[in-house]
Amino acid sequence: MPVHEIRHPLIRHKLGIMRRADLSTKSFRELSQEVAALLTYEATKDMPLAPASVEGWCGTVEVDKITGKKVTVVPILRAGIGMLDGVLSLIPGAKVSVVGVARNEETLQAHTYLERLVGELDQRLALIVDPMLATGGSMVAAIDMLKRAGCREIRALTLVSAPEGIDAVLKAHPDVQIYTASIDQGLNENGYIMPGLGDAGDRIFGTTQKHAE
């Protein structure tokens, strides 16, 4: 299955706290990173291993070592930055590519305005992070950009997803795996996920008075 809704108790609990409208910016930001780390754990479960040896306190010890493609983490600006540290806490050696995608609030269409990608993308696994998968336009645009640059193995990590966004991504890119903490009911007339989390970017960066505590 290309879609993985991770219903681990820790994720369910933390996401439930994040849905509170009165949650502080600090708490929302910290929980975004924690859930991102838990999603990363699930999204990398099939990484290949190879035997290796190290010198331990009692001599040579046989261990396992991750092999295969290197990783690049790809936050979609700006909200994806809120998940970046969570991923890097588990894969600290990963290179970071940055994609800027904006959505026209009238047409709901996405357009890219920034591209800062690392090299050798054809040899890397890309983990795209964006808290909200709503219409899917931003995610599709980011995947388009990565594939044009040569990346062939891409996985998307989101906190909350709408069925409409999932369908849009899989229609455009059926080879992409989606890992999400929750598949919510759907979109409202303004293209926002219901019940969702509100505007994740505003809540992570504290750019609205309501969540700026």
Curated annotation (Swiss-Prot):
GO annotation terms (biological process): UMP salvage; uracil salvage
Cross-referenced InterPro entries: PRibTrfase_dom, PRTase-like, Upp_B, UPRTase/APRTase, Ura_phspho_trans
Pfam families: UPRTase
Top enzyme category: transferase
EC code: 2.4.2.9
Key words of the record: Allosteric enzyme, Glycosyltransferase, GTP-binding, Magnesium, Nucleotide-binding, Transferase
Pathway the protein acts in: Pyrimidine metabolism; UMP biosynthesis via salvage pathway; UMP from uracil: step 1/1
Annotated positions binding 5-phospho-alpha-D-ribose 1-diphosphate: R78, R103, D130, P131, M132, L133, A134, T135, G136, G137, S138, D199
Gene3D superfamilies assigned: 3.40.50.2020
Cofactors demanded by this protein: Mg(2+)
Record flagged with keyword Flavoprotein: no
Catalytically driven reaction(s): UMP + diphosphate = 5-phospho-alpha-D-ribose 1-diphosphate + uracil
Protein family per UniProt: Belongs to the UPRTase family.
Protein name: Uracil phosphoribosyltransferase
Organism: Bordetella pertussis (strain Tohama I / ATCC BAA-589 / NCTC 13251)
